[in-house]
A protein has these predicted regions:
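Juxtamembrane/disordered regions of integral membrane proteins
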Residues: 1-188
Length: 188
């Protein structure tokens, strides 16, 4: 099997941060500029941006060649699992009791599990999940701080940028981590 040269962990984190940060900025622009009326429709439109664009952007980090569509569909599935858990807890807890944090915890655990299954990685779930959760949470809550401080359109866009940079860094690391066993197996 011919594979693409594997990206380093640093490159994966930086590439994930930049690419997912830009996608997140675009997604949060829907909220920032009030482009879609109604809460359910707005969240659906934001999720659609992530579902459609993220897999295409992060595909560059996959080592298997010619997997653009397959990876994009896989990523959409993994992101959908995350989004379902996040929305379920956020809406059920009505924005209280750290529903966003609990939703992220469960959603990112599901995403990590799906990535490990897809890439055949059988070890290091806790490490991979912990790093993803940490980067995501730092980005999300730093973005929230910016929104609290600046408010309005600027605050919303900054929230999107910070959330995307943090989440993207975690996703870049997750892809690097999950592909390590595959790289080791192929290079033997």
């Amino acid at each position: 099997m011919t594979i693409r040269p594997a990206a380093t962990q640093s490159f994966s984190i930086i590439f994930g941060s930049i690419s997912f940060g830009l996608i997140s900025l675009l997604a949060y622009a829907i909220w920032a500029f009030r482009l879609v009326p109604g809460q359910a429709a707005m969240y659906s439109a934001i999720a659609a941006i992530y579902l459609i664009l993220s897999g295409f952007a992060l595909n560059r980090l996959a080592i298997a060649p010619k997997v653009l569509l397959r990876f994009a569909l896989f990523f959409a599935t993994a992101f959908l699992a995350y989004a379902i858990f996040w929305c379920l807890l956020w809406f059920q807890l009505k924005g209280k009791y750290h529903g966003d944090l609990w939703g992220s915890l469960l959603g990112l655990a599901a995403m990590t599990w799906l990535f490990q299954k897809a890439f055949g990685s059988k070890r290091g779930f806790l490490a991979a999940f912990s790093i993803l959760f940490t980067f995501h949470t730092i980005g999300y809550y730093q973005g929230n701080e910016c929104y609290t401080y600046f408010g309005g359109t600027t605050g919303r866009l900054l929230w999107g940028a910070f959330h995307g940079v943090g989440f993207g860094a975690g996703l870049g690391n997750l892809m690097f981590h999950c592909q390590k066993p595959l790289i080791e197996k192929i290079s033997k």
